[in-house]
């Protein structure tokens, strides 16, 4: 359930919107989230989704979901469907049906014809290499193409023939006629159409010319009545082109969109480049786009992150024009905080040590009811059985304890969570000297109460060996060992492969034992394993006969670079 407090507090974009509404410039807010369907959404997109949909929600406006699908070779319906699923999972609903920039191709073509008729666009025959040479540099003005002064009639004829498929791919382009001496390279006669014979996921084989993003995006905003077009700072230099196109096309749109930029999210210890994420998948460093170690929304969902936790993270990351570098601990902290409130509790033992309760009758089972959550009675209770043999965590016992150790030691006492106080009477070892079993006695008068006259400080979790559910647990950690794996240069000044910094211990699969309540859980069921961390039943691999739990986050931030 959304509420207005879940979104970023006052920031410069909210100030702009409030001024626009107060002045009457706009009667209502209309935003859009415009992903290209060429990959899976990641954490940076989650921030943008929360911003665009959140602003529409705060100001009782609308937010469109529009697919900017102008690159047919890279886009497909798999990505379209995944993006829609991710947006809905995050808790947002777009206005009307999803939009596609490709639905506007006819209008875009007509506007291009209008630009040609006005002498503001021309067909160019320069090759890509020649075009780069003519473009100039940041410090040197460009040169006019020798084809820049073609007549309107010739340009109309050539553009029509481009559309009709009379020329080879890449042989001609349509360029805007702006200023080759502009200090902004984006304004040096940018290409707005290219010839490309490629099947399009939405329009099929109707077109063999496709519009460029910078031309398409602003017109799509105008067609949809977008009031505030929000994008990251790398598009700041594209804003003059955005405005130029809208100022020069013959468009009767009532709303004049404006572009505003904010800093993109840079999350440490991961990468968000689609190309590099694809490399991880192709080279099988991960199991797929939804691998729980990936920063994709589908990966984070499979890891056990919640929509509420991601929205909280987006709020804490904030919106500004300054650099937005955020440590992974901020993301994990938001997820941890949300799960602390929402996740029911179970006990599970990851590294079991056998404990025999010598004065508990063999074959007997005793059950005690325990709350699923200490602060939410409505979550109910479960039965926690105890029998003569239990498992505890191996590191909850120390034969030679360090200073301050408050758990089980030879001759010492500890309380079993939701159970008795036990005392370690004997340590059993194998031939190699490894501890393989503890023989303990229980204090029968301590179930649900403290022993009179003595203080037992330690409390440990455990499971009944006879009743425990055997589960598969995947212990996930950060995918990279350094903050910026794609920004390290070698001695020669060249960037080192980001894969050099993959964390070899980013996942470890073990067999563990959990309370019997863990046996029949549905997929994507989130739990706190008491004293260990937060876990989720895997949305793909979990089943009644093969329970699989993924570690979402530990109870505390104890991560150290490897």
Swiss-Prot record:
The keyword Plastid does not apply. GO terms for cellular component: cytosol. It catalyses: tRNA(Gln) + L-glutamine + ATP = L-glutaminyl-tRNA(Gln) + AMP + diphosphate. Keywords: Aminoacyl-tRNA synthetase, ATP-binding, Cytoplasm, Ligase, Nucleotide-binding, Protein biosynthesis. ATP binds at residues 36-38, 42-48, 232, 264-265. The keyword Ribosomal protein does not apply. L-glutamine binds at residues 68, 213. Gene3D superfamilies: HUPs (3.40.50.620), Ribosomal Protein L25, Chain P (2.40.240.10). SUPFAM superfamilies: Nucleotidylyl transferase (SSF52374), Ribosomal protein L25-like (SSF50715). GO terms for biological process: glutaminyl-tRNA aminoacylation; glutamyl-tRNA aminoacylation. GO terms for molecular function: ATP binding; glutamine-tRNA ligase activity. It is found in: Cytoplasm. A motif ('KMSKS' region) lies at residues 271-275. Its EC number is 6.1.1.18. InterPro entries: Gln-tRNA-synth, Gln/Glu-tRNA_Ligase, Gln_tRNA_ligase_bac, Glu/Gln-tRNA-synth, Glu/Gln-tRNA-synth_Ib_cat-dom, Glu/Gln-tRNA-synth_Ib_codon-bd, Rbsml_bL25/Gln-tRNA_synth_N, Ribosomal_bL25/Gln-tRNA_synth. A motif ('HIGH' region) lies at residues 35-45. It comes from the Bacteria. HAMAP family: Gln_tRNA_synth. Monomer. Belongs to the class-I aminoacyl-tRNA synthetase family. This is Glutamine--tRNA ligase. It comes from Neisseria meningitidis serogroup A / serotype 4A (strain DSM 15465 / Z2491). The gene is glnS.
């Amino acid at each position: 359930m959304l509420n207005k407090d879940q979104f970023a507090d006052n920031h410069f974009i909210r100030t702009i919107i409030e001024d626009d509404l107060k002045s009457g410039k706009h009667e209502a807010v209309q935003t859009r989230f415009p992903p290209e369907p060429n990959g899976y959404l990641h954490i940076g997109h989650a921030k943008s989704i929360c911003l665009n949909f959140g602003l529409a929600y705060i100001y009782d406006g609308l937010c469109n979901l529009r697919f900017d699908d102008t690159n047919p070779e890279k886009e497909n319906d798999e990505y379209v469907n995944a993006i829609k699923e991710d947006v809905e999972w995050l808790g947002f609903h777009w206005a009307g049906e999803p939009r596609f920039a490709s639905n506007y191709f006819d209008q875009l073509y007509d506007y291009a014809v209008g630009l040609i008729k006005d002498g503001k666009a021309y067909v160019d025959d320069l090759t890509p290499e020649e075009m780069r040479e003519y473009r100039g540099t940041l410090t040197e003005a460009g040169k006019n193409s020798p084809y820049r002064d073609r007549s309107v009639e010739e340009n109309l004829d050539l553009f029509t023939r481009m559309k009709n498929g009379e020329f080879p791919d890449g042989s001609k382009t349509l360029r805007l006629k702006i200023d080759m001496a502009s200090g902004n390279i984006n304004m040096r006669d940018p290409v707005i159409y290219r010839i490309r014979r490629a099947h399009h996921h939405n329009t099929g084989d109707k077109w063999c010319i496709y519009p460029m993003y910078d031309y398409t995006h602003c017109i799509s905003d105008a067609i949809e009545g977008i009031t505030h077009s929000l994008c990251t700072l790398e598009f700041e230099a594209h804003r003059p082109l955005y405005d130029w196109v809208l100022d020069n096309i013959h468009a009767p749109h009532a709303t004049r969109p404006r572009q505003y930029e904010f800093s993109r999210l840079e999350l440490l210890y991961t990468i968000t480049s689609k190309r590099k994420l694809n490399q991880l998948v192709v080279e099988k460093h991960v199991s797929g786009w939804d691998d729980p170690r990936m920063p994709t929304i589908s990966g984070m969902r499979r890891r056990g992150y919640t929509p509420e936790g991601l929205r909280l993270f987006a709020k804490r990351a904030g919106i500004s024009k300054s650099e937005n570098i955020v440590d992974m601990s901020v993301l994990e902290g938001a997820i941890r905080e949300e799960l602390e409130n929402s996740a029911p509790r179970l006990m599970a033992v990851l590294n079991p040590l056998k404990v025999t309760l010598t004065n508990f009758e063999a074959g007997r089972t005793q059950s005690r009811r325990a709350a699923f959550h200490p602060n939410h009675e409505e979550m109910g209770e479960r039965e926690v059985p105890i029998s003569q043999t239990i498992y505890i965590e191996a590191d909850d016992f120390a034969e030679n304890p360090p200073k301050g150790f408050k758990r089980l030691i030879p001759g010492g006492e500890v309380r079993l969570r939701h159970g008795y106080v036990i005392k370690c009477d004997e340590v059993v070892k194998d031939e190699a000297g490894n501890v393989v079993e503890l023989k303990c006695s229980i204090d029968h008068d301590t179930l649900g109460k403290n022993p009179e006259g003595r203080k037992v400080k330690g409390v440990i979790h455990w499971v009944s060996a006879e009743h425990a559910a055997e589960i598969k647990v995947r212990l996930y950690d950060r995918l990279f060992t350094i903050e910026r794996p794609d920004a390290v240069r070698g001695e020669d000044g060249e960037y080192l492969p980001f894969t050099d910094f993959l964390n070899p211990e980013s996942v470890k699969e073990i067999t563990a034992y959990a309370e019997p309540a863990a046996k029949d859980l549905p997929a994507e069921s989130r739990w706190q394993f008491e004293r260990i961390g937060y876990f989720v039943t895997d949305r793909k691999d979990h089943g009644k006969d093969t329970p699989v739990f993924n570690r979402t986050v530990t109870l505390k931030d104890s991560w150290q670079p490897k």
